[in-house]
C-alpha cells in the first residue's frame, strides 16, 4: 500500500527506514494546505532545518471529478532539478530526493519568516519590486531554456526540449480543466478556447512553468521564490504570461481600492518580462497570444473546474460577462487588454 504522508506515524517510519531521520530523532510534522493536487507536509528538525514533502494525488481535491496520474511527481522532481540551474540563484528551493513508488518528492523548506505572495496581494499590499522580480524570474526561465541545446545539458541528447517534450500533465491539469471544460460550458467562447488549446500544443519555444502565479510564490527577505512544477513542459511561453496576468487582473477586480495600482503593476510585470526575452526569435509574435491566453484564463477561473475562491458570486458573474465581451472583440496588445478589462470592470460596477 502506498504511503500516506498525512499519516505522521507512517511518515516517521518511512523517513527512518530511508535514513533521512535518525531513530528517535525529534522531528515535527505539519500539513501545509492550499493546493488541490498534492498532499504537502513540512518536516522540521530542532536545529532549524526543514524539508517540504509533496505527494501527488490521483484525484484532485475539488468539487468536480478531476483526475491526473500521480506519476507526474517525476516531472516535478525533474523540473526542480533543472530550475535549480536555470532560474536565478535563490529563486527555487533546493531539490532533496524523489520516490516514484510512493509518488513523493522532497525539497528544502524556505525559512519560516516567509510569506505567501497571494496572501500579501489580497491584503492590499502592492509592492512594485515584487512584480519586477516576477517578470525577471519568468523572463530568465524562458530565455535560458529557449535554445534547442541548453548550456545546462547534462549529457549528449538531453536537450531541455526533449527532457520536457511530454505535455500529458499540462493537458490534464491545465488545458482540459481550464480551456476545454470551459469551452463545453460556455457556448460563446467554445471556438475561441478550442482553437487556443490546439494552438498552444503546437508552440515549442521554451520551458513553461504552467502554474506561474502568486499562490506559488513565497517572499523571503523581500525576494521571490517559485514553487510547484508538476505541469512544467516545453511549450508556449504565452501561457505562463497570461496565467500570471489573470491573477493580477482578477485581484484588481476583487480589490477596487487597489485596482489602479494592480493594473499598473500588471503592466510593469509585462514590460519587465518583455525586456528579458526581446532578443529571442519568438518574442515578436508573443503579444497577441498572451492577450488570448489572459482572456481564456480570466474566463476559466470563473467558469472552469478551478474557480478563484476569493471572487464573490457577483464578481464571478461580472468577470464572466466582461471576458465574453473581450472574446467577441479581442484587443491586440497586452496594455490594451489591461486597460480594456479595467475600464469594463469600472463601467459594469457603476451600472
Language model feature labels by segment:
Residues 1-10, 108, 141-150, 156-199, ...:
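Active-site catalytic-loop/activation-segment of kinase and kinase-like phosphoryl-transfer enzymes
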Residues 1-29:
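Juxta-kinase regulatory segment immediately upstream of eukaryotic protein kinase catalytic domains
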Residues 20-27, 77, 189-202:
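Short Pro/Gly-enriched beta-strand edge/turn motifs at strand-loop
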Residues 30-53, 194-239:
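Active-site acidic catalytic loop and adjacent metal/ATP-binding pocket
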Residues 32, 37, 41-155:
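ATP-binding pocket architecture of kinase catalytic cores
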Residues 78, 238-280, 294-313:
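Active-site activation/catalytic loop segments of kinase-like enzymes and analogous catalytic loops
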Residues 257-260, 297-351:
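ATP/Mg2+ or Mg2+-diphosphate-binding catalytic cores
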Residues 285-297:
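Amphipathic alpha-helical protein-interaction segments enriched in hydrophobic
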Amino acid at each position: 500500500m502506498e504511503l500516506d504522508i498525512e499519516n505522521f506515524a507512517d511518515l516517521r517510519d518511512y523517513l527512518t527506514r530511508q535514513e533521512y531521520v535518525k531513530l528517535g530523532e525529534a522531528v515535527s510534522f505539519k500539513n501545509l494546505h492550499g493546493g488541490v493536487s498534492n498532499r504537502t507536509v513540512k518536516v522540521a528538525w530542532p536545529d532549524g532545518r526543514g524539508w517540504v514533502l509533496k505527494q501527488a494525488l490521483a484525484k484532485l481535491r475539488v468539487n468536480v471529478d478531476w483526475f491526473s496520474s500521480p506519476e507526474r511527481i517525476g516531472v516535478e522532481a525533474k523540473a526542480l532539478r533543472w530550475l535549480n540551474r536555470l532560474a536565478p540563484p535563490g529563486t527555487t528551493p533546493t531539490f532533496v530526493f524523489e520516490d516514484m513508488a510512493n509518488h513523493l518528492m522532497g525539497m528544502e523548506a524556505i525559512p519560516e519568516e516567509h510569506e505567501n505572495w497571494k496572501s500579501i496581494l489580497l491584503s492590499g499590499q502592492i509592492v512594485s519590486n515584487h512584480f519586477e522580480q516576477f517578470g525577471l524570474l519568468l523572463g530568465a526561465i524562458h530565455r535560458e531554456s529557449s535554445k534547442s541545446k541548453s548550456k545546462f545539458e547534462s549529457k549528449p541528447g538531453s536537450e531541455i526540449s526533449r527532457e520536457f517534450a511530454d505535455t500529458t500533465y499540462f493537458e490534464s491539469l491545465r488545458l482540459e480543466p481550464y480551456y476545454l471544460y470551459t469551452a463545453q460550458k460556455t457556448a460563446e467562447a467554445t471556438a475561441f478556447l478550442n482553437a487556443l488549446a490546439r494552438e498552444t500544443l503546437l508552440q515549442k519555444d521554451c520551458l513553461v512553468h504552467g502554474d506561474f502565479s502568486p499562490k506559488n510564490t513565497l517572499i523571503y527577505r523581500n525576494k521571490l521564490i517559485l514553487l510547484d512544477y508538476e505541469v512544467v513542459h516545453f511549450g508556449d511561453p504565452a501561457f505562463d504570461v497570461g496565467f500570471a496576468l489573470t491573477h493580477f487582473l482578477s485581484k484588481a477586480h476583487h480589490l477596487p481600492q487597489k485596482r489602479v495600482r494592480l493594473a499598473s503593476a500588471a503592466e510593469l510585470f509585462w514590460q519587465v518580462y518583455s525586456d528579458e526575452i526581446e532578443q529571442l526569435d519568438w518574442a515578436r509574435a508573443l503579444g497577441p497570444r498572451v492577450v488570448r491566453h489572459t482572456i481564456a484564463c480570466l474566463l476559466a477561473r470563473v467558469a472552469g473546474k478551478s474557480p478563484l475562491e476569493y471572487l464573490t458570486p457577483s464578481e464571478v458573474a461580472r468577470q464572466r460577462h466582461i471576458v465574453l465581451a473581450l472574446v467577441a472583440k479581442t484587443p491586440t496588445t497586452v496594455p490594451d487588454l489591461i486597460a480594456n478589462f479595467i475600464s469594463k470592470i469600472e463601467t459594469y460596477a457603476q451600472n
